[in-house]
Curated annotation (Swiss-Prot):
This is Ribulose bisphosphate carboxylase large chain. Keywords: Bacterial microcompartment, Calvin cycle, Carbon dioxide fixation, Carboxysome, Disulfide bond, Lyase, Magnesium, Metal-binding, Monooxygenase, Oxidoreductase, Photorespiration, Photosynthesis. Substrate binds at N122, T172, K176, R294, H326, S378. GO terms for biological process: photorespiration; reductive pentose-phosphate cycle. InterPro entries: RuBisCO (IPR033966), RuBisCo_large_chain_AS (IPR020878), RuBisCO_lsu_C (IPR000685), RuBisCO_lsu_C_sf (IPR036376), RuBisCO_lsu_fd_N (IPR017443), RuBisCO_lsu_N_sf (IPR036422), RuBisCO_lsuI (IPR020888).
Length: 474
């Protein structure tokens, strides 16, 4: 027997009904296996928060705008997302934290791509909402165990480099575009020879007419090997393998491996999570470290009421795979409140992180022994920032000075030496029990007395400050 769209069958009534009748379940207790999400929801005028939260749960899981008879062909209660709690956002009008629980069966194993497609893929354009932001997610251990995670992790990287007890030092080669491959390699050599551990391609240097990737790789690795031989330290350069296609990306990665590169680089947001996960698995299989740049992140995470918070993007990267990830500086030119920044830094590198609203962490996260990601502090930092950077980030971080190395009045190598001396002075002072937060400037001045390179850097950048209030606050 055929039925029209308006006829009633057993258990089915066609038409449109409020989302909250099905997807708002305040009595629900989340399971240990649920993926949990916290959304900041701004409803349109006249839309109750319960309806808005339920709409988010519905449109990011099993729901659509009208009742469909095929709901009868599945167990909707088993598969639907549930808005189980709603809280007003403190200090904000008509904004609510809506907490949604998703059954684990909604997501493909080991796929950040699928997880994000479900949770944020469609609902952000929903007309009933003025704005929507994904603030945090809780990934259950049962789902985490389907991901490889970082190719190597912090401890394996330290063992590969034979460097312990201090942050690593890096430098982004500037100008980021326009140098020939040979001159680029020269800058790499000078910075590594001066005392840095790493140098780096910038995010947008791929394979342009002025510098094709193969030429850059060859000149750079010649510089790396020469600096290693002269200093006796293991050195590296982040060779950017981001490419127009995955096939080309792997071609570049294979060539980097052939010429002895210990580390390569990838722009994970612009290239996509599928490409990144594939590259991370290749890096583990081939013993290559993977540096991750977050180019394009601020397009997604900068607005306070719409988008995806970087702590979510950082969690997704740890699952997808990367050994380093840019994470802001707190003290440099880029956005970064200290409490919030350290919240997602801990989520990158610690094994277990308790919920802490003061740091923007809405859920306790157990990483189930997944290797950690080393945060990279980069953007407008120089020698005067060194004490604060060491005090804030501790040992397991990469402190990356681009202009703060290459902008030294005496050149690249003295700039690198100034940073290395400043770092070693801060580590020694800390290990002797001195307070870097209170005595930082004095520690740098003392070291500058016997290091002319550091003294010149201190004089050049003594007046440089970036005093803007962060946008990303609680």
């Amino acid at each position: 027997m055929a039925y029209s769209a308006t006829q009633t069958k057993k258990g089915y009534q066609a038409g449109v009904k409020d989302y909250r009748l099905t997807y708002y379940t305040p009595d629900y207790t989340p399971k240990d296996t649920d993926v949990l999400a916290c959304f900041r929801v701004t409803p349109q005028p006249g839309v109750p928060p319960e309806e808005a939260g339920a709409a988010v749960a519905a449109e990011s899981s099993t729901g659509t705008w009208t009742t469909v008879w095929t709901d009868l062909l599945t167990d909707l209660d088993r598969y639907k997302g549930r808005c189980y709690d709603i809280e007003p956002v403190p200090g904000e009008e008509n904004q609510y934290f809506c907490f949604v629980a998703y059954p684990l069966d909604l997501f493909e194993e080991g796929s950040v791509t699928n997880m994000l497609t479900s949770i944020v893929g469609n609902v952000f354009g929903f007309k009933a909402l003025k704005a929507l932001r994904l603030e945090d997610v809780r990934i259950p251990v049962a789902y985490l165990k389907t991901f490889q995670g970082p190719p190597h992790g912090i401890q394996v990287e330290r063992d590969k480099l034979n460097k312990y007890g201090r942050p690593l030092l890096g430098c982004t080669i500037k100008p980021k575009l326009g140098l020939s491959a040979k001159n680029y390699g020269r800058a790499v050599y000078e910075a590594l020879r001066g005392g840095l551990d790493f140098t780096k391609d910038d995010e947008n240097i791929n394979s342009q007419p002025f510098q094709r990737w193969r030429d850059r790789y060859l000149f750079v690795m010649e510089a790396v090997h020469k600096a290693q031989a002269e200093t006796g330290e293991i050195k590296g350069h982040y060779l950017n393998v981001t490419a127009p296609t995955c096939e080309e990306m792997f071609k570049r990665a294979e060539f980097a491996k052939e010429i002895g590169a210990p580390i390569i680089m990838h722009d994970y947001l612009t290239a996509g999570f599928t490409a990144n996960t594939s590259l991370a698995k290749w890096c583990r299989d081939n013993g290559i470290l993977l540096h991750i740049h977050r180019a394009m992140h601020a397009v997604i995470d900068r607005q306070k009421n719409h988008g995806i918070h970087f702590r979510v993007l950082a969690k997704c990267l740890r699952m997808s795979g990367g050994d380093h990830l840019h994470a802001g500086t707190v003290v440099g030119k880029l956005e970064g409140d200290r409490a919030i920044t350290m919240g997602f830094v801990d989520l990158m590198r610690e094994n277990y992180v308790e919920a802490d609203r003061s740091r923007g962490i809405f859920f306790t996260q157990d990483w189930a022994s997944m290797p950690g990601v080393m945060p990279v502090a980069s953007g407008g930092i120089h020698v005067w920032h060194m004490p604060a950077l060491v005090e804030i980030f501790g040992d397991d971080a990469v402190l990356q000075f681009g202009g703060g190395t290459l902008g030294h009045p005496w050149g690249n190598a003295p700039g690198a030496t100034a940073n290395r001396v400043a770092l070693e002075a801060c580590i020694q002072a800390r290990n002797e029990g001195r307070d870097l937060a209170r005595e930082g400037n004095e520690i740098i001045r003392e070291a500058a007395k016997w290091s002319p390179e550091l003294a010149a850097a201190c004089e050049l950048w003594k007046e440089i400050k970036f005093e803007f209030k962060p946008v990303d606050t609680l």
